[in-house]
Amino acid sequence: NQDTYFHLSRIIGLDNVWSSPVNFNNFDHHGTMMNIFYPWLTLYPAFLFYKMMGNLVLSYNIYYFFITFLTMVVSYFSMKQIKNNRYISLLFSIIYTFSAYRAIDIFHRASLGEAVALTFLPLILMGCYEIYIRDYQKWYWLSIGMTLVVYTHLLSVAMVSVFIGGTLFLSFYFWDQKIARLLSLLKATVLTFFLSAGFLIPFIQQSRAQELKVPLGKELSGMAPSDMLTHILNNNYNNYTIGLFLFLGLIGAFIFIKKLTADDLFIFFLGVFVLFCSTNLFPWQLFNHTPVKSLQFVWRLNGFSSLFIAYTMSIVIYYIFSTKNNSWKIMVFTFLALILHLSGVSNSIHANKDSLTLIAPEDAVAIAENYNHTDYANKESIYHPDMINNDQYLLGNQEINPTTHFMSNKLTIELDNSNNKNTVLTTPIYRYKGQVASINGKLVQTKLSKFGTTELTIP
């Protein structure tokens, strides 16, 4: 998937992130301000792996292993806080971490940002559980979870916020100590904003400075239930579903529904409703002219349905088999989960074997450096693609071929102005608020060209 190239380019572009929001050594050397518009903090370990090992492909894979391990730890910790039962916590950790949709994000879509955001959803679930139901003084867990998602994937932040708002509306009537719990939710919101300000403020500042090319919304449409059931039963990871293992857990939860408390039932039916919303039975057409269109793909909801169903499934499995030899039974379910996980991944690889692209370690850095990504450029650049794609430089109205040198923090352009007068140099370099340029060591002002790129006057 081209998202692999995108994230590899992001990784190598973090080598100067503490000194500059722009790196000229990635995204085809056009000076994309990616680190302002796409959160990077939780990606930074991947860059550290790369610096230690010097192998971009290996570092990328180790980072996914690290995130998978972290997902297991966060899931176990979150469920342990909710249920105070290590067996339920272990079951939830395994079921959620090796859920089909998370595997699809990693292996089929290469959607690293969303996959990492899934790591922190259990923490947000636990934070909401404390505020809504139990010890509202532990509201800080919600802030920690939300902040980590903010520094990972902005669309996931929007989706989580909608879920928090929806569950607040549905559950508020049943709360005790309503004022105290609302204040705790407000505290969590305020703290999240302050903790996230390092990303949010520059993001808002640059977004307001000019009209940008951003990922477009798409016509929203769910999957036909018959198709969804077929893909689930086939454990097909080429299509975006919750997978066979969670589906079996969903059926089991309906059969043993009396094992669930009122709180568990709320989470379970929330998962069922979200799964229903991912089908074409839900009237998504009504939202195609609203901000909801930014969701782009309805199947993104599977991350949330996987969370809620995995929560319920772990409880049901435990209470069905809560006799002796719990460790042995957990091992059996772990084995089953891993078998279905591996079969789904291997089937997906086999089905796509003719279209797979293998990135050799020795080629990875060059591929990442030269990958051209046009999101977050000035919107006007959409109408002049040749300027970017062909690296065109114009001195006045004449195309020239200057010598260029790229460093992480700096792009140097060498040319002679033979016009003997001030002439405008138009470059294929993106322009953002705060850009610094100099000619022969003297600071000069830059402007936004009619092509949506940087221009400056050469004496």
Predicted regions and their residues:
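Membrane-interface alpha helices of multi-pass inner-membrane proteins
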Residues: 127, 139-154, 188-194
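Periplasmic/ER-lumenal interhelical loops and adjacent helix-loop junctions
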Residues: 182-185, 189-255, 369-372
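Membrane-interface transmembrane helices that cradle and orient dolichyl/undecaprenyl
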Residues: 124-138
